[in-house]
Structures are given as structure tokens and as C-alpha cells.
């Protein structure tokens, strides 16, 4: 009798332990399910911006060009598109210029197809200038979350010593009004720096770009009055060997800084990183 009672108690204890274990497992599964959309989209759970590069159905290239620059060099954008899926679908490319004018072109991508444009604005839009381009394959007629694509962007130019390029980060998260920072700018006889933003809203956007040196001293402030749906860039009018920019937009925006070698026009693109205390 005593043996049977002890056996029954051990069985009940084991069942309770298994029940508690299942509850903990279910709590973990539910927590993971909440985080999964952010993980799948390549986003940090505390931000709308991408944490890693992933295939997507909506991508912003924050800076594109087909324009003559400060030193007389012509800057062009090389865009590479790749469809890793088994579907054939269109990607709508929307070019936003400095005035907020928007031009749309549909690019059909076959399954497994790759397209490369050495002068994207000239080849696709038959235009010159500078701005930003949004690529979209889901929020269009006949779109689907299955129509994912991969994109790579570069601004390049040719000088007497050869070809030089600047890799441009592509963005898959939404624009926001949060403060953001671009660290590592430089302005001297060898390098120049620009700050810019794409206003992803239908309202005028006043973006205050505060420039600090490495000791956190405010050196200068550049104010960008960006029209609705427009892109704007301006030079940093100060000399500093190392510094950073704090962007404060009044409307949702994608902001960046770019450091350019004055001799080669080789550049370093620095997308602004959001910071929310």
C-alpha cells in the first residue's frame, strides 16, 4: 500500500513538472511569435529601420544621381536588381527630385532575373539631376508579399586616375521623425561632407542638422527646408577633422551624410541611425 501511494505521488509530481514545462514552452513560443515579424523583416525590435539587409517588397535608395558635381565630375547611379523568387512580377520605381516631383516606371522582373543599370536615372527615367528612388512590388496593383527582390546601389564617377564609387545603403524600414545621427564626417582641404534627407511625407519638412566635433561641441547648424515628397542635400560649411551630425526632422524623413575625397571623388555614405532614449 505504501509503495503504491509513493508511486502515485511520484507520477503526479512528474505530471505537474511536465505541465509547468509545457506552459513555459508555450510562453516562449508566443513571445517568439510576437517578435517574428520584426525578425523576418530584418528589423531591430526597437526601431522601424532594418537591422540587417534582407530581400524585401519595398526598398528606398536614399540618394541617386545623374549630375555634374562640384569638381566637374559627372556622378551617376549604378543600380542592380535581382529577383530571387519563382514569380514574374513588376517593381514600381518612383523617382523623387529636389522639387518633390515624382516619376513612376514599372520594371518587370522574371523569376531569377537580374538587371543592372550603370546610369539608372538616365537609363530608366531619361532624366538628369539628383534625388531618391523608392522600389515597390507589394503596394501596387497586382502586388504580393511574395514578390521580394534584392537591390544594390552605388554612386560612381570617373576622374583622370580612374573610376571611383560610393556604396549607398538601401533602406527597408519606414521613415520617422526621431532624432538620428551620422557619425564620422570630415571637412578640410582633402575632404568635403554633405548632409541630405528624403522627405517621405506630403508636407513641407524642416530638417535641422546640427554638426558637432569629436568633443561634442556644436560647430554649425544646417537647416534643410525640404518640399513635400522631395530630396535635398547641402554642404557642411565648417572645418573639422572628425565629427557627427544630429538630424531633427519635423516630418518623417530618411537622412544621411556623405564624405567625399576632393581629389578622387571617392565617397563614404553614412545613413543616419535613429536614437530614441
Residue ranges and their predicted role:
Residues 1-21:
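Short, Lys/Arg-enriched N-terminal segments with co-localized hydrophobic residues
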Residues 11-12, 31, 159, 234:
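Enriched - but not universal
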Residues 14-16, 37, 41:
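N-terminal start and proteolytic maturation junction detector
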Residues 20-29:
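Bacterial N-terminal signal peptides that target proteins for export
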Residues 29-37:
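Bacterial N-terminal signal peptides
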Residues 40-277:
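Gly/Pro-rich, tryptophan- and cysteine-flecked surface segments typical
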Amino acid at each position: 500500500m505504501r509503495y503504491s501511494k509513493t508511486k502515485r505521488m511520484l507520477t503526479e509530481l512528474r505530471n505537474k513538472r511536465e505541465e509547468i514545462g509545457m506552459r513555459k514552452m508555450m510562453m516562449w513560443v508566443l513571445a517568439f511569435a510576437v517578435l517574428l515579424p520584426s525578425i523576418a523583416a530584418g528589423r531591430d525590435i526597437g526601431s522601424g529601420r532594418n537591422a540587417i539587409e534582407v530581400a524585401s517588397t519595398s526598398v528606398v535608395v536614399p540618394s541617386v544621381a545623374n549630375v555634374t558635381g562640384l569638381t566637374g565630375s559627372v556622378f551617376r547611379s549604378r543600380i542592380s536588381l535581382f529577383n530571387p523568387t519563382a514569380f514574374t512580377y513588376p517593381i514600381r520605381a518612383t523617382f523623387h527630385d529636389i522639387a518633390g516631383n515624382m516619376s513612376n516606371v514599372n520594371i518587370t522582373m522574371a523569376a531569377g532575373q537580374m538587371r543592372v543599370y550603370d546610369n539608372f536615372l538616365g537609363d530608366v527615367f531619361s532624366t538628369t539631376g539628383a534625388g531618391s528612388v523608392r522600389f515597390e512590388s507589394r503596394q501596387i496593383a497586382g502586388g504580393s508579399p511574395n514578390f521580394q527582390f534584392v537591390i544594390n546601389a552605388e554612386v560612381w564617377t570617373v576622374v583622370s586616375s580612374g573610376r571611383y564609387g560610393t556604396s549607398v545603403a538601401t533602406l527597408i524600414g519606414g521613415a520617422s521623425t526621431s532624432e538620428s545621427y551620422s557619425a564620422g564626417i570630415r571637412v578640410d582641404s582633402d575632404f568635403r561632407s554633405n548632409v541630405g534627407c528624403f522627405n517621405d511625407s506630403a508636407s513641407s519638412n524642416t530638417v535641422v542638422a546640427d554638426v558637432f566635433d569629436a568633443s561634442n561641441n556644436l560647430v554649425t547648424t544646417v537647416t534643410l527646408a525640404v518640399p513635400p515628397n522631395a530630396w535635398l542635400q547641402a554642404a557642411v560649411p565648417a572645418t573639422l577633422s572628425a565629427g557627427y551630425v544630429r538630424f531633427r526632422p519635423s516630418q518623417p524623413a530618411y537622412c544621411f551624410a556623405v564624405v567625399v575625397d576632393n581629389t578622387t571623388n571617392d565617397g563614404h555614405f553614412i545613413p543616419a541611425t535613429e536614437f530614441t532614449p
